[in-house]
Curated annotation (Swiss-Prot):
GO terms for cellular component: cytoplasm. This is Imidazoleglycerol-phosphate dehydratase. Pfam families: IGPD. It is found in: Cytoplasm. GO terms for molecular function: imidazoleglycerol-phosphate dehydratase activity. One of its GO terms (biological process) is L-histidine biosynthetic process.
Length: 196
């Protein structure tokens, strides 16, 4: 099987990012964005999706940093998926974390789109603005060329809501990126191909 990996470096006047991704990893995470909560959430994505992800990033403000990491990570997923032949393609996951429950459904269709139903009681999670959770997911979906529906069903602790959401994303991505041996070498589409 061809290695499904990507390495991307991105440098702008606002951010500097170096990222590597292995879709067929073991959940190894090395995150260094300078934002501890963001590193924690990105680590959930690696650990529970069984992806090996290394990210080194810094930026002039948290909004630019989160946006550009999402953009770069989305591009890495798209690149690592290649022509998307043999993948399961569509998957969903519902994940609890104590008081909170989150659900993610996605389609690695080659068309970026995001629908969000997220609510947080506060505007900030220990220095991480909660609106950036939505922005991260939307940017990741568009750049990763996947259709993403994400929902926080309920919860009383904002940290738990966000963590359940990232874990649900990880589990759904793990399933959708998996190779189905019955589809080996074939795009999972009646069109015979998926956009990439």
């Amino acid at each position: 099987m061809t290695k499904r990996t990507a390495s991307i470096k991105r440098q702008t006047t606002e951010t500097t990012i170096s990222l590597s991704l292995n879709l067929d990893g073991t959940g190894q995470a090395d995150m260094c964005t300078g934002v501890r909560l963001f590193d924690h959430m990105l680590s959930q994505l690696a650990k529970h999706g069984l992806f090996d992800i290394n990210i080194s990033a810094n930026g002039d403000d948290i909004h630019h940093l989160v946006e550009d990491v999402a953009l770069t990570l989305g591009k890495a997923f798209n690149e690592a998926l290649g022509e998307r032949k043999g993948i399961v393609r569509m998957a969903d996951a519902t994940v609890p974390m104590d008081d909170s429950l989150a659900s993610v459904a996605l389609d690695l269709s080659g068309r970026g789109y995001a629908v969000m139903d997220l609510s947080f009681a506060k505007n900030d999670l220990t220095g991480f603005p909660t609106d950036l959770v939505r922005h991260f997911l939307e940017t990741f979906a568009i750049e990763g060329r996947l259709n993403l529906h994400a929902r926080i069903l309920y919860g009383s602790n904002d940290h738990h809501k966000a963590e359940a959401l990232f874990k649900a994303l990880a589990r759904a991505l793990d399933k959708a990126t998996s190779i189905d041996p019955r589809r080996e070498g074939v795009a999972p589409s009646t069109k015979g191909m998926l956009e990439n």
